[in-house]
């Protein structure tokens, strides 16, 4: 029988509930337990797919094609269990499901209310999500409840968690509450009052936390922990300090050293083997002792909010671990390139253009791609970054001066990138879309396997085939591929069913390392294994740096 750990947050948002939940899951998995995680989001949107990156940050795509919260990316990076659509749900999905049932008459004429109908539906979604775990029936399901205690939006989720813990009985569920202990510089001390009030608010709802994770910019002294324990009615050893560190991969060891996994296992009456966190220790050791260093420029329009590129940033960090190379990422606003030119790129060892939507900033990205191609600087284009690389090549090499995407110019006569109208999903089902389709849930989503052209750089990196996740509406137009290939561009991977271009590259006679991919490889990178594409990219950046240093010498 699956047991549940509910993770809640108090005082303020963005304290790191997702990292804390993922770190706990990693420790429990290291003890031989099968673990899954769920994220409950209180917003009314059905999913984050149509939300602005400035509002929500990255949208993480699961293997089965769900657009989910970025915390699911942390979950997959910290444990071996893969996430699915059922691992993330929102208030919007809950209400949509309940209203559909009411319209069908499932409630037999009853008045449909938040309690019990909404709370029952939340519990059903939680249990369904746990049951769908890719690891089989999990021993523990960790349920992260988004938002902050006291928010109106979170109340139904907290009430559902309270009811569920009561229904399951003792030793079947426990609560971990993450809260802020701020340091007041003028007073020169940490303040515990916000934590006391947060726990009090939680207890008013009927939930008494078993563990407190106290976030601060420093380790919390024993005296303060005792005070928190006294006023919060939580045992002193269950008041756990979570201080700022320079790498999230240090968190599992930090929590284990303070006994979090022991407390959870005792509360849930679990008797697993001892934790083995040697993998995490080795990762941290590699992270802190690199042998090389490179600087990669990430050219985009969301560079002021790095949460928009969370998985991509982590994938580069994973590559740094597996190449013993410190990767410095410089975020470059593509609109500034449009105004000031490409001088800001000339010191870089490699250039990366990530995915994105909309016309704004695209000409700056194209200018960056042109610079990388002409200066022989390693280039990686992801999703939109591949499409723009094709547009730049079509304009500047093939001579199609009006080459563009119909996303940016619907009337362009040279539509080298255009809307996909029909494709197969990962299960072989035909999906269709038109210009008038809803934005939400109408992209090509999820993982798909496709063969790689022999003798290409793509084959060196991936082998015979590639299986990656997608999130896009537009695709390189096959009508222009013969002209692109006549100019030297190589389509190195295509979908087996629709023959859609998945990867492009330039031959080594034209460029040492120039690759574009229509998919999102960052979603499958983990600290354990890294990712072959990002490892190859970092190695190319290092080779470019060493070659330039040799020329200058």
From Swiss-Prot:
Residues that, per the record, bind CTP: 13, 151-153, 191-196, 227
Domain Glutamine amidotransferase type-1: 295-547
Catalytic reaction equation(s): UTP + L-glutamine + ATP + H2O = CTP + L-glutamate + ADP + phosphate + 2 H(+); L-glutamine + H2O = L-glutamate + NH4(+); UTP + NH4(+) + ATP = CTP + ADP + phosphate + 2 H(+)
Protein activity control: Allosterically activated by GTP, when glutamine is the substrate; GTP has no effect on the reaction when ammonia is the substrate. The allosteric effector GTP functions by stabilizing the protein conformation that binds the tetrahedral intermediate(s) formed during glutamine hydrolysis. Inhibited by the product CTP, via allosteric rather than competitive inhibition.
GO cellular component: cytosol
A Pfam family matched in the record: GATase
PANTHER family: CTP SYNTHASE, CTP SYNTHASE-RELATED
Note: CTPSs have evolved a hybrid strategy for distinguishing between UTP and CTP. The overlapping regions of the product feedback inhibitory and substrate sites recognize a common feature in both compounds, the triphosphate moiety. To differentiate isosteric substrate and product pyrimidine rings, an additional pocket far from the expected kinase/ligase catalytic site, specifically recognizes the cytosine and ribose portions of the product inhibitor.
Name assigned to this protein: CTP synthase
Species, as recorded: Burkholderia multivorans (strain ATCC 17616 / 249)
Gene: pyrG
């Amino acid at each position: 029988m699956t047991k549940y750990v509910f993770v809640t947050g108090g005082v303020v948002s963005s304290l790191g509930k997702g990292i804390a939940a993922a770190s706990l899951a990693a420790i429990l998995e290291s003890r031989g337990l099968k673990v899954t995680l769920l994220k409950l989001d209180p917003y009314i949107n059905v999913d984050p797919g149509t939300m602005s990156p400035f509002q929500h940050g990255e949208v993480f795509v699961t293997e089965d094609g769900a657009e989910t919260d970025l915390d699911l990316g942390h979950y997959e990076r910290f444990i071996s269990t893969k996430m699915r659509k059922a691992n993330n749900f929102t208030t919007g999905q809950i209400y949509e499901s309940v209203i559909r049932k009411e319209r069908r008459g499932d409630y037999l004429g009853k008045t449909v209310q938040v309690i019990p109908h909404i709370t029952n539906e939340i519990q059903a979604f939680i249990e369904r999500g746990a049951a769908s775990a890719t690891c089989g029936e999990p021993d523990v399901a960790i349920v992260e409840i988004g938002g902050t205690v006291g928010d109106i939006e979170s109340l139904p989720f907290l009430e559902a968690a309270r009811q569920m813990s009561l229904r399951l009985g003792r030793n079947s569920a426990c609560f971990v509450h993450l809260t802020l202990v701020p340091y007041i510089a003028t007073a020169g001390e940490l303040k515990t009052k916000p934590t006391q009030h947060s726990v009090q608010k939680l207890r008013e709802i009927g939930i008494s936390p078993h563990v407190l994770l106290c976030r601060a910019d420093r380790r919390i002294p024993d005296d303060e922990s005792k005070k928190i324990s006294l006023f919060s009615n939580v045992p002193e050893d269950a008041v756990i300090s979570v201080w700022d560190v320079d790498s999230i991969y240090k968190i599992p060891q930090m929590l284990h050293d303070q006994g979090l996994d022991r407390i959870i296992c005792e509360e849930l009456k679990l008797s697993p083997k001892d934790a083995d966190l040697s993998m995490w220790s080795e990762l941290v050791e590699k992270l802190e002792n690199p042998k090389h260093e490179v600087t990669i420029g990430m050219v985009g329009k969301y560079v002021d909010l790095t949460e928009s590129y969370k998985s991509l940033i982590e994938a580069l960090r994973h590559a740094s671990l597996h190449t013993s190379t410190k990767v410095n990422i410089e975020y470059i606003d593509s609109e500034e390139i449009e105004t000031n030119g490409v001088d800001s790129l000339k010191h870089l060892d490699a250039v990366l253009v990530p995915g994105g939507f909309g016309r704004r900033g695209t000409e700056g990205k194209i200018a960056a791609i042109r610079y990388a191609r002409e200066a022989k600087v390693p280039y990686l284009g992801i999703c939109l970054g591949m499409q723009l690389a094709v547009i730049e090549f079509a304009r500047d090499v093939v001579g199609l001066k009006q080459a563009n995407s119909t996303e940016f110019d619907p009337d362009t006569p040279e539509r080298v990138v255009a809307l996909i109208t029909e494709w197969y999903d990962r299960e072989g089902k035909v999906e269709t879309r038109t210009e008038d389709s809803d934005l939400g849930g109408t992209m090509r989503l999820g993982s798909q396997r496709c063969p790689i052209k022999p003798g290409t750089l793509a084959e060196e990196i991936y082998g015979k085939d590639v299986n990656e996740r997608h999130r896009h509406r537009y695709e390189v137009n096959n009508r222009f591929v013969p002209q692109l290939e006549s100019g030297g561009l190589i389509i190195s991977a295509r979908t087996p069913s629709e023959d859609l271009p998945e990867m492009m590259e330039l031959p080594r006679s034209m460029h040492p390392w120039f690759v574009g991919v229509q998919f999102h490889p960052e979603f499958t990178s983990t600290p354990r294994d890294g990712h072959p594409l990002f490892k190859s990219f970092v190695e190319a950046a290092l080779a470019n740096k060493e070659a330039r240093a040799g020329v200058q010498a």
